[in-house]
Amino acid sequence: MSSKQIQKAGDNSVNVQGDKVTIVTGLTYQEVRQVALDVFQQNFYQLAGVAADTARDRAEQITDKFLKELESRNPEGLAAATDPDFLYSLFTAQREHARAGDDELGDILVDLLVDRTKEQSRTLIRIVLNESLRVVSQLTSDQIAVLSLIFTLRYTKSYGIHNTKSFSKYLKTRIAPYIQGLPETYAALQHLDFTGCCSISIGSVPLENLVAGRYPGLFSKGIPQEELADMQIEEPIVNKLLLPCVRDRAKLQIKSINEDALRNQATELGVSDDTVKKLVKLDKSHRLKGDNLWKEIDAMEPQLADLRKKWQSLRLGHVSLTSVGIAIGHANVRRVTGESSPLSIWIN
C-alpha cells in the first residue's frame, strides 16, 4: 500500500510531511490554539456522535489550560509551536486527556507541557518530558501520589525548616497531602516499576531517616555537659556551634538544623573537621528515636501514623524513582503545593 502526500506551503509556514502536521511561525496565542486543535482533529481517530463531541471538548479544554499556563510561566515558549517534536508532544497530551477526561491528569499533562516548551534543543530533560507525557496516562491517581511522596521524601530537602513550627507546617503541606491517596496493594508499585517510573531494590530506607533524619537538630535530647568536657575539645570557639537544649536546658545541643548546616557554620568559624565529626557522633547518641520520636511527630501531624503503616505494607522504603518518575512526581507536587522549583535541579 502506498500513499501520496502533497505539500503546499504558504507564507511563514513550515510543512512537516507524515502525520498531518503543519507548523506556522510567528503566531499569536489564538493562532497557536487553532494550530493545536487542527493537529488534534487531523490525527485523533475519528469518533461519531457524542463521543466525538466529548473528545473535541476535552482537547479544547486542555489546549486552553496549556496556553493560559504557558502565558503565565513561559511566554517565550510560544515559539515551540514551530517545533514538530513539541507539536507531537502536545498532541500526545490532547489525545490522552481526550481519552481519560480526568482533571488531575489534565493538570499534570499541562505542567509537563509547559516545562517541555523550555527545551528547544534535544536535551535529556526534553527526552524525559516527552516520555513522561506518554507514560503518565498509564498511571492511577494513587500511583502518582506514590511518585510525589517518594520524590518529596527522598529527593528534596526543605531549607525553610528552622524549628518545630516550620517542621509541622512542612509535614502538613508537603507530606500529608499524599498519604490518604496512597494505594492499598503492592500491585500498584509493581505497575510503577513496569512503566519505568521507579525501581524496586532489595535494600530499604527507613521512614524515620527521611522524615526526621534530614532535620536532626529538631530532635535532640541534649548532650550532657560532662560528656562534652570528656571529649577534650581544644577549640573554645566550638561553643558557638552549641545552644541550650530545647528539651532540657541543663544540656546542650548543636545549633544547626542538620549536618550540612553545621559544617558550613564550622567552616566560617574555623572549627576543624575532626571536631565537627566528634560533635556529630556525640549528638547522634542523644537524639529521639523509635516510639519517642514518632510520638512527637504524630502530635504535629497525625496522618504520619498512617504513613508508617503504608511504608511497611507497600514496601515504599525499597522504591527509588527513575528520571520519568521524578518528572511526573515533580509535576504533581507543583499541582498540589504550588511549589515551582525547576525540574533541572534533578534532571540535567
Pin down the residues of each PLM region:
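Extended, charge-enriched "interface" segments that sit outside catalytic cores
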Residues: A59, T63
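Long, low-complexity, charged/polar intrinsically disordered regions in eukaryotic proteins
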Residues: T82-S137, A145
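Functionally critical alpha/beta secondary-structure elements and their flanking flexible loops
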Residues: K65-P84, F91-A93
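Long, low-complexity intrinsically disordered regions enriched in small/polar
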Residues: M1-G49
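Short helix-coil junctions and helix-kink-helix linkers
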Residues: S166-P183
